C-alpha cells in the first residue's frame, strides 16, 4: 500500500483522515524522500544529456545571459536563511520590517502635512503681500510727504529704514523651533504606531500560533526520524519480523484453520450459529469485495485468530465504521484497543483509546505481512504477532501507546460472522 502511494504521490483524503498524526508525518517524510529521489534521477539524466556533444548555437549580438554564483565546492552558491549564527531570528526580522514600514508611513504623512502647510502659508502670504502692496501704493505718497515735512520741522534727518536682513535674523529662530517641534511630533507618532502594532493582540496571537505550529512540525518530524531508525534497528533482531531491506519473504500458506470458536459476550450463553434465521443487512459491493479478500487472502494466514489457539482473538472485529469503533472504546479505559477490517485498504485499522481520546492506525496487509502504514521496517508474520509486539513496545514514541486491554464484542452476535461463514 505504501509503495502504491509513493508511486502515485497521492493518498485518498478518506484514507488520510484515518491516519494518526505520527503516521501522517512519517508518510509525508517518505513522500518527500521519494520526491528527492526522483529529482536526483532527473538531474542525473539532465547531466548525461548535457554531457553529449551539442552543436554550438551562434551567439546573438548583445545577447543577455545569467551566470550563477558558485561556492568553494564549485556548486551553485545557496544561502539558507536562519542557519548562520549571524542570521537574525524570525520574530526580530518581523519587528524590524514592521518598524521600517511604520517609519516610512509616518515620514510620508509628515512630508504630506508639511507640503500642505507650506502651500497654505505661501498662499496666505501672497494674499497678504498683495493687500499690503495695494494699501502702500495708496498711502505711500502721502506718508512720504508728511514724514519729510515733520522731519524738516523738527530739524532731524531721515531715520534708517529696517533692512530685509534684520527680518530674516528675527524669523530664523522661529523657523528652527517649528522644525524641531515638527520632527519631535513625527518621532512620537512613529513610536506610537509601532507600539500599537506590537501590542495588537491578534497579531501577537497569530505569531504565537505560527511559532507553535513550526515547533510542533519540527518535533514530529524529528520524532518520526528517530522512530524510523529505532524500529529499523530492532527489526534486524526481532522475532517474527521481516527485514524490508531484504524484501518481504512470502510465507508458505498453511492449511486452512478449523472452524473458529467464536467468543460470546459476557453473560450470554453460547448458541449454535447454524440456520437460525439471522436477519442480515444489505451488504454493499465494497463490503463484498472486502469479505472476499479476507476469505481468500487472510484466512490462510490465521488473521483474527489468537496466536496459539483456534479461537478468534477478543480484540478482533469485523467491518466497523470509525464511529462504531469509537462507541465500543468509549466504555473502556486508556490502553483499550481493537482491530477492525478496513474498507479503505487491503488491511486493518487499529483503534486505540488514550488519555486524549481515540486514535486510529492503519495496518497494511498487502504484502502478506502486517505493518503500520508508513512504518515499513517491522513486518509481522501475523496480526497476533503485531499485537504481542506492541504490548511491550509503544506504537509511537510520542503517544506511548501500549496495547493493554482488548475491547471485545458487546452485541449478542459477533460482528465478524460474515468473514468466517
Swiss-Prot record:
Record's function text: Inhibits estrogen-induced cell proliferation by competing with PLCG for binding to ESR1, blocking the effect of estrogen on PLCG and repressing estrogen-induced proliferation. May play a role in T-cell development and function.
Protein's UniProt keywords contain Cytoplasm? yes
Q: Where is the SH2 domain?
A: 315-407
Q: Which residues carry this modification: Phosphoserine?
A: 117, 123, 232
Q: In which tissues is it expressed?
A: In the kidney, expressed only in the glomerulus. Expressed in T-cells, B-cells, macrophages and dendritic cells (at protein level). In adult, highest levels are found in muscle and lung with lower levels in kidney.
Any one Gene Ontology molecular-function term assigned to this protein's record:
phosphatase binding
UniProt main location, coarse: cytoplasm
| Keyword Cytoplasm listed | yes
- Give induction info: Upon CD3/CD28 stimulation in CD4 T-cells.
User: What does the UniProt keyword field contain?
Assistant: Cytoplasm, Phosphoprotein, SH2 domain
What the entry lists under InterPro entries is as follows: SH2, SH2_dom_sf
Q: Where in the cell is it found?
A: Cytoplasm
Span of the secretion signal? none
Q: How does the record describe its quaternary structure? A: Interacts with ESR1.
Fetch the PANTHER family from UniProt: SH2 DOMAIN-CONTAINING PROTEIN 4A (PTHR14388:SF5), T CELL-SPECIFIC ADAPTER PROTEIN TSAD (PTHR14388)
SMART domains xrefs: SH2 (SM00252)
Q: Where is the composition biased (Basic and acidic residues)?
A: 163-201, 211-230
Provide the protein name: SH2 domain-containing protein 4A
A single GO cellular-component term on record: cytoplasm
Q: Where is this region: Disordered?
A: 132-271
